[in-house]
Amino acid sequence: MTRTARDLLRTITAELAFDPRSNPLVPLIAAGEADREILAVLALEQLRVIPADRRAFLQLAVRSSAEPEADAFFTALAEGEAIAQQRLPAFAAACGVEEARAAAYIPLPGCQAYPAYVAWLALNAAPADAVLAVTANFSAWGGYCATIADALRTHYGFDDEACAFFDLFAGPAEHLDRTAERAVQAALEAGRLDESSARAYGRLLQSYEALFWRTLERPA
């Protein structure tokens, strides 16, 4: 029986599911046990990650000009990152991060490895392979954001505006999922999907995601 894009996306997402032990920080935030300074550093790092990812997704959209389904996927991702960039300052302000500190902040290498690799994908990966890898990674990210948004309200007293950045990623993304499915299906039918490369890209994204959270837990 011929595999569908939906089956492939589900399979690879399951294969690349995070080991809960790889992220020690989100459980601490969920319990209200993470120091507020760690939340501030999270905000500072995301102030660098989000615009970088947006530009990377725009580059992937440009490189997908011959693949309209992949183009639509990466364009939608870039639009989402633009919204996230608008919402992020409220979270940073709630963490006590002032503009002067944000401007002078030196980012942590372990936190910036993820966006650096997304930028590498933007320049080197076949667009359809990148769709598959990125979609698998977003499943874990969305779960983390849902947990953090709830914890910020419950344990840290943050209001809706301060949590809106995480709410954006925590909610269902059915339209994006359908767009990813169409992009992968088109690549399957055209014979241009390299599952081995997509899996390798996905594993590296998951590893850099885990490194991001481990670095935040011990920023020094």
Residue ranges and their predicted role:
Residues R192-A220:
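Acidic, carboxylate-rich catalytic segments that either coordinate divalent cations
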Residues R6, E69-G171, S207-A210:
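Active-site-proximal alpha-helical scaffolds that flank and shape metal-associated catalytic sites
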Residues M1-L9, A40, A116, R214, ...:
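Sequence termini and other peripheral, non-core segments
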Residues R10-R21, I29-S64, D129-T147, Q206-W213:
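Alpha-helical bundle segments that constitute or directly flank the non-heme di-iron/ferroxidase center
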Residues V26-A31, W120, L188-R192:
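Short, charged/polar, low-complexity loop and linker segments
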Residues M1-V26, Y105-P109, E174-R178:
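Acidic, low-complexity proline/glycine-rich segments
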Residues V41, E45-R48, A52, A76, ...:
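A non-catalytic, amphipathic alpha-helix used as a structural packing/dimerization or gating element
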Residues R178-A187:
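Transmembrane alpha-helical segments of integral membrane proteins
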